[in-house]
Amino acid sequence: AAMLEQKKVTLEIAGIPMPSFVKLMLKQSINEHHYFEITLDIQAVEIYGVEIPNVSKDWIGKKVIMDFGGTIFIGIATMVGLHRAGGTHGNIKVTGYSSTFLLESDHTCASWCNKSLSDIVKELTDKAGVQALVNPETKSKLEYECQYEETNFGFIQRLARQYQEWLYYDGQNLVFGKPQPGSTTKLIYGEELSVLDVCSQALARPIKGSSYHSVNDQTYNGQSPDAAAG
């Protein structure tokens, strides 16, 4: 049987290259944050001058860069812990999310009038310092759009669902809208793919909504498109 292609993986945390790691797990989903777990050997980390008692303070909130044979993933460390068992010197466990996690603000309320989807999403990503490629199929300006008791990322997720736009993280950028066309990549089950599922799904009916703007005594109506773009 054919074997999955092996890629050289390198790792950097808070600007420090890690010589090795015990375990690395990266879970990627469309429309969601990506999640990772890294287990490091304490002795290997100490070689690079990392002070173990201060590792939590020094690493939490810092950038984590993974290089999978030229494919880059950039994330943020959100938890660092020390694990010891069986009398061993122990391991350091680092968990975190894609840089999109910076959009997890407090639940807030905001509104926009006569702004496009691009304007709204770019405003939020720029404010959070998240690199984004914003190119929605919906180009027209929206009469009225509001964010109500949602995090910034939750609001962007809702906009993607409401207007049936792509939303995913490509390892370095949050992509909102139709991705740029690229070259065709051939994937073979048993080589590049270890699991393959094929299915069909019935979608909900288009979303309709309306809101009243008391300042100018106007009612605004909106509807999601009937068909997904892309």
Predicted regions mapped to residue ranges:
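Amphipathic alpha-helical and helix-coil boundary elements used as assembly
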Residues: 1-230
